[in-house]
Each structure stands twice: as structure tokens, then as C-alpha cells.
């Protein structure tokens, strides 16, 4: 299997230490939690398993259910780096509503740190139209959108060094190790 890029489409997904056992259960530890709209790289699909081995945009690896992600292209990953278009949700949770008003019907729940695409800012004062990782569109309070501080460049096929996330970040910052450690 060739590695490929994907984004999380589930509300959130648990990054597991291992794939499921022969009974289809995953009793392994939870290594991390990843959220809707986050980019990942699929590293391996084990025959007959529902879990894929992935690597996150910050260098963690583990297993997630195949149904919790969808493939994207390198071009789509590149477009997602536009910080005027892709934002992180900055509140613990928010309803994605069908209309730009408090009385709108909830379509889905968005969790803190999920990545959404801004489709239209301030459609009415205080409300913006967004699209979440699975593709559903709706409205949220504009004040809940936060600038992404990170990017997904580590997952790019252009990053072929294979020396790990922190090495790649250090190279991008082009600083001495001591300075780099202080920054992270």
C-alpha cells in the first residue's frame, strides 16, 4: 500500500497504540485524541483490519478506524495551509447551526481544536459560514474561530527526510538546538 494523506471526518478519533484484535475489539491504550479536520498521513492498512496506522501533523503515530478519515490530495493539503481560510475552533464546543442565529437548528457538535474551513465571514453580524472536515456546512459565532498556529507541512510528500517531526520543525526554524528546545 502506498502512503496517502487524509483528514479526520469524525467529530474526534482516538489514536490507539495498536490495531484491533482478532475479535474486532481494540483494547489497546489511547495515545492521543485527534479532531475533525485534522490532517494525517496513512502509513499502513493491515489486511482484514478496520484500523489504519497513521501519523499526525505533529508527528505522533498510532491507529484510527478507517471510517473516521477520508483521503485528500497533496494539492488539497497545500490549500489547507491558508490561514485566512482554515481556522481552529477556540471554544470547548459549539453547535454547527443551519442558520446564522441562536435559534438555528443544531446540525452537529464541533469540538475545541477542530479545523473548519471559512466559507463566508460575517454573513450576518457575528456569524460565519463554515465547512467541517466531513463536508457539512453550517454557521457558528465568528468569535469562536481562532487562527491556526500550526500547519500540516510535516505531512507533505516534499518532507522526505524521514527524521521525525521535531527534526523537521527545527530545520524549518533554522535555529540551534538549545533555542529550539526553549521555543517548544
Regions of interest found by a model, annotated:
Residues 1-14, 19-48, 55-88, 99-109, ...:
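Boundary regions of SH3-family modules and the immediately adjacent low-complexity/disordered segments
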Residues 91-94:
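A eukaryote-biased sequence property
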Residues 113:
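Internal, well-ordered alpha/beta segment that forms a basic, Gly-enriched binding/recognition surface
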Residues 169-184:
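Catalytic cores of peptidoglycan-degrading enzymes
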Amino acid at each position: 500500500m502506498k502512503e496517502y494523506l487524509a483528514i479526520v471526518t469524525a467529530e474526534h478519533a482516538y489514536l490507539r497504540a495498536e490495531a484491533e484484535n482478532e475479535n474486532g475489539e481494540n483494547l489497546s491504550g489511547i495515545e492521543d485524541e485527534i479532531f475533525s479536520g485534522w490532517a494525517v498521513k496513512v502509513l499502513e492498512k493491515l489486511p482484514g483490519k478496520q484500523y489504519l496506522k497513521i501519523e499526525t501533523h505533529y508527528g505522533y503515530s498510532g491507529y484510527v478506524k478507517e471510517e473516521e478519515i477520508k483521503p485528500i490530495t497533496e494539492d488539497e493539503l497545500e490549500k489547507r495551509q491558508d490561514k485566512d481560510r482554515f481556522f481552529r475552533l477556540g471554544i470547548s464546543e459549539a453547535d454547527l447551526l443551519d442558520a446564522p442565529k441562536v435559534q438555528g437548528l443544531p446540525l452537529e457538535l464541533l469540538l475545541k481544536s477542530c479545523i473548519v474551513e471559512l466559507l463566508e465571514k460575517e454573513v450576518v453580524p457575528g456569524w460565519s459560514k463554515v465547512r467541517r472536515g466531513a463536508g457539512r456546512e453550517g454557521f457558528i459565532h465568528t468569535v469562536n474561530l481562532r487562527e491556526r498556529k500550526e500547519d500540516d507541512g510535516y505531512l507533505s510528500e516534499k518532507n522526505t527526510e524521514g527524521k521525525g517531526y521535531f527534526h523537521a520543525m527545527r530545520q524549518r526554524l533554522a535555529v540551534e538546538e538549545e533555542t529550539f528546545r526553549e521555543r517548544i
